[in-house]
Amino acid sequence: MKSWCKNLLAVGLSVAFLSACSSSDVEEEPVSELVEIQATVFPEISWDTNVGEGVGDYYSQLRPTVRYGKLFVADRSGVVVAFDEVTGEELWSQNFNEEFEQKLRTKTKGLRLAAGVTAARKKVFVGGETGLLVALDEATGEVLWSAQANGELLSAPTVAEDVVAVNTAKGAFEGFNVDSGEKLWTYESQLPNLTLRGTSSAAYEAGGFFVGTADGKVAVVVKNNGQAAWEQPVFSPSGGNEFTRMADVDMTPLILGENLYVASYNGNLVSMELRSGRIIWSRKYSSFNELAEAGLSLYLVDDHSRIYSVDRRNGLELWSNSTLKNRELTAAAVVEGYLVVGDLEGYLHFIDRSNGDVVGRIQVDSEGLYAQPLVVDDKIYVQSRSGKIAIVTLSKQETKVEEDTNASAE
């Protein structure tokens, strides 16, 4: 089945219109088989454990975060766990379904966490498909406050000084007081008839939240009052049906210096002036994955799992890799001289940033990886669909050869 069918969210459309996504008439696109590679880097799992039951086959952007000397992890069912960053020892665990039993009594499917984990201001923030936003004490896991957002929370909250902001699936971008959970303001964007299932997390800079919208724009929302400073279309759709007019901006805008970079589904990768939103350059790429960057290069995984390196000064393509096409790749992360992406079969692939060649891989969990790997120093943190949490580290060819030689001598 085409990947976009699995991620659609209908708003006011008939079931008959969407039935094409499960129809045998929809041509399946082949998943690229893994081919033999010339490995020059050798990833190893240095630590792993399980948290809850994972996210299963559901859409989710839950991913671990590291701060305050701790690794924070959540699962879909409402379990949040803190581990010591160095030793891996479990420090505390919180089960929201027990904590919010009364509030969730009428919600037969539970909390369904899908947004987070964000750690800031000595707190840990997570959100769910019920619209519940929760703040925990980072040291103890105690629930400090909870608040109800106007719609599903499908992307990580953004904390800026005294405000925590969330982007809902109903097109409402809302700000809450970081210490009390009081709702401060709401910015409404237009929600098209058909969108991808997902929302953009916001970036924050100089008093403004920069957030992508479902109608293909980037908006700057002033932290102090929730008003829009400017809006700029990334892509203006003109297709003849709802599918071709989809233009969601579901990634976090990437801010580098005085410029902002972002891509839309069905649309463009653009560079904008941060202050005005003026488009500096625009190139045709379709993506809903987070951008990665290093030096003067942007790295993009498109909607068919093709990987690109683009010069951020002018948008010129430096290289592309389609050997992992349709493997439902995660967004890329940068680790040393490589990109790392996960796939539907639970492999992490390591790609040489200079030329796009795949130079290493390791299978973490056959149930699959779904969210962008988190890189902290020399450690790569990943979360699988089954709930496995793993730390992956790299060994270079020279080290590997030396180890093999020593083993042979023994």
What is the role of each PLM region?
Residues 18-20:
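C-terminal motif of bacterial Sec signal peptides marking the signal peptidase cleavage site
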Residues 75, 128, 168-169, 213-214, ...:
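Structural signature of WD-repeat beta-propellers
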Residues 84-87, 137-140, 177-181, 223-226, ...:
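Short loop/turn segments that connect beta-strands within beta-propeller blades
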Residues 300-309, 316-350:
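Loop/turn-rich, solvent-exposed surfaces of beta-rich toroidal or solenoidal domains
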